[in-house]
């Protein structure tokens, strides 16, 4: 896989583009749980597929490249991006995951975004893994999804480049002292530890969408 340092881009792939929309790239039709159980019994869906499912559940929206990098963070060798993409394709065909891409006035996006599908939630529940996903989550607008993708990249960058990296939280929550209102930072949070001392960083991602200044203040 090409390293991040080798990619020369003037504009972030997660920046907003004029006229950008989200386009469905998943599977239509019906898949039964019996079909999925058969695939598991036949060895077509294995432990690494379940790990991928857990990663998507944790991050909500994520690219295949980010999944690759997080698998490496967990000490799992995906072998190659093509092999990982084949596994993702299998999960999409089984309606365990679904997939989208962005299109804009500049053309079709170069990456796919993966998120949970109904069968994925069933499988997570069967393993007693917490899954707060609702089908309506997949209707979130482009701006919200790109914030999540940018937040994913912050977490990955800290893990790969900062020796003091300790842990991360995808959706850290802050509670206002006076109002008691809970805010969830869109960029995630990381904990750095060195010489027995720890410090937490929480990130808020801003995308230049319509009314972005007002949304940021709110």
Predicted regions and their residues:
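Amphipathic alpha-helical dimerization/coiled-coil segments
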Residues: 124-169
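Active-site metal-binding core of divalent-cation-utilizing nuclease and nuclease-like domains
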Residues: 143, 155-199, 204-212
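Nuclease-adjacent, charged terminal/linker segments that flank catalytic cores
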Residues: 1-128, 138
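Basic, amphipathic alpha-helical patches used to engage nucleic acids or provide basic targeting signals
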Residues: 212-218
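Glycine-rich, often proline-containing surface loops adjacent to acidic residues and nearby aromatics
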Residues: 63-64, 130-137, 197-203
